[in-house]
């Protein structure tokens, strides 16, 4: 438990969020003295209208939600800061006590993907930069209105692309930047996966203030699209058969179909007790919605997903014949769980 000038310090998002987990609090007084300083200090774009009271009448739960508040503040003597919330989240470190279970599950997923993709797996080849910018049959074109990310504060992706959406071209200075990164990768230097934190402008539950998300740098995004988008397309094309769900409609029968397919697969391997539990969860009701809470923060599990992708790449004709491309893919996947986060400004 920590105090500054007799006031408790916590991040305001959770009652369990006192700062006892922080190793160094020498600068916390400076932070607490500038409660109005935050990069997203502008007000939310949401505002209440005359329809709000009507919405509460129809759906009483509406009153449990509110417009986000982006400013750090002191309420009832408690300093609430999104910076601290983000630090707390990033300080949570998981540890796998028995790795054999995860490796067995990874091997099962790998075999399942190989069986269902079959020879289609050999379609997987890196995209050209033109394909990345324009998009393909299943992937969207680059969103040129979104942030360019680190280190180009305040700039949009539109600042690095010229031409129409049908014929986009990277500007020369940025194309040279990508070329330089790839040349460094060929010397064994991984690309940098650098994210900056920002606050989501979305309606949130009362007491939560707002949500923090990570905005990645565009260079790394382009590399991920070049080398991983073709595999994601294969996953999407076979999403009715795979447990790897990209672009799945989470609301509706498709989610239930996924669970039923998983149930059918578990039938072959489960113990009687596991079957009884799984059947009670899946078979006796229709599931129309689902979410994996904070899955993107569980970097321990990401390690195994990365290995599955490497195993799949090692089977393909292209990556067998192009050792340099396989080495680049390895460095990109390695950077996926060795990222740098810049909190606030």
Per-segment meaning from a language model:
Residues 1-345:
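Viral RNA-dependent RNA polymerase
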